[in-house]
Amino acid sequence: MQAPPPEHCPGLESEQAGKASACAGCPNQGVCSDPNKKLEDPGKALVVESMKDVKHKLLILSGKGGVGKSTVTSLLTRYLARSNPDSNFGVLDIDICGPSQPRLMGALGESVHQSGYGWSPVGIEDNVCLMSIGFLLGSVDDAIIWRGPKKNGMIRQFLSEVDWGNLDLLLLDTPPGTSDEHLSVVSYLKDDTNPESLCAVMVTTPQEVSLLDVRKEINFCKKQNIPIVGVIENMSSFRCGNCGNSSEIFPAKTGGAAAMCAEMGIPLLGSLPLDQQIAKACDSGEDITEFKNVTTEALDGICSKIIASFS
């Protein structure tokens, strides 16, 4: 296995790449210090080889934190797997400092094993597997205090040294913003010969403070030439379990996701309400695919649109 960058790695594009004291002993030192190869990441070829049997990669993005990217990722994965039992799905949690997928997918306490083909992802269902840095920590309360280069090295290992096998779709749960993790994963997965192999779904809540950052994320994808499948409006309303009436917890003062999608020419995949039953199930890692309510009906519709976009 290739070693991750040193903790104080100056980065591939730094003038000190391969020359700084932190570079001593790094297996990539010679490549980084070569001016003819400095912009050529030595891990790219390893990622390409490892991901050759992964048909599609789907980034779950949002410029704003707390809008439910991780929850939406887990819900989409479960519904896609249930409605497409002959297809294989994977989830990669690249929120390095705040991994949530082990809890959401009911895999807390699981560990990753090494095989001759690399790390084996944790099996969730017969056709779903998961990889997260949460499986590599001694405790769920351990803090990860890493700089960008070390995060990037971890992401590269997840992409190149995990035995993903044959996957029809790999969903990537991302942190907020457009930071090191996003730039790293795009640089490794973007394939100019097959631009449709890497796509994105945006998650937002109805209020303008969220939409403002999602617009930035959409523009990030456009600059990187990443096709956007559509936008999911999460927490669009709250339906009372007693009276059945709906209320807007986050009022859409500027028209919400629908208005933004119309303005920016992006499909609106659907809206998901706040749902107490779903929230409790996610906290305990339960499978929610057998639930029958407004939220699960909306999820079915959203998943159908996502599958159709890959056809």
From Swiss-Prot:
Top-rank taxon: Eukaryota
Location within or outside the cell: Cytoplasm
Family: Belongs to the Mrp/NBP35 ATP-binding proteins family. NUBP1/NBP35 subfamily.
Ligand binding (ATP): G63, K64, G65, G66, V67, G68, K69, S70
Database matches in Pfam families: ParA
Ligand binding ([4Fe-4S] cluster 2): C240, C243
Function: Component of the cytosolic iron-sulfur (Fe/S) protein assembly (CIA) machinery. Required for maturation of extramitochondrial Fe-S proteins. The Nubp1-Nubp2 heterotetramer forms a Fe-S scaffold complex, mediating the de novo assembly of an Fe-S cluster and its transfer to target apoproteins.
Molecular function terms, GO-annotated: 4 iron, 4 sulfur cluster binding; ATP binding; ATP-dependent FeS chaperone activity; iron-sulfur cluster binding; metal ion binding
A GO cellular component annotation in the UniProt record: cytosol
Designated gene of the protein: Nubp1
Keyword Nucleotide-binding recorded: yes
Subunit structure of this chain's protein: Heterotetramer of 2 Nubp1 and 2 Nubp2 chains.
Protein name: Cytosolic Fe-S cluster assembly factor Nubp1 homolog
Primary residence: cytoplasm
Annotated [4Fe-4S] cluster 1 binding sites: C9, C23, C26, C32
Single GO biological process annotation from the record: iron-sulfur cluster assembly
Cofactor requirement: [4Fe-4S] cluster
Co-factor note (free text): Binds 4 [4Fe-4S] clusters per heterotetramer. Contains two stable clusters in the N-termini of Nubp1 and two labile, bridging clusters between subunits of the Nubp1-Nubp2 heterotetramer.
InterPro entries associated with the record: Mrp/NBP35_ATP-bd, NUBP1/Nbp35, P-loop_NTPase, YlxH/NBP35
Iron-sulfur is among the record's keywords: yes
Keywords: 4Fe-4S, ATP-binding, Cytoplasm, Iron, Iron-sulfur, Metal-binding, Nucleotide-binding
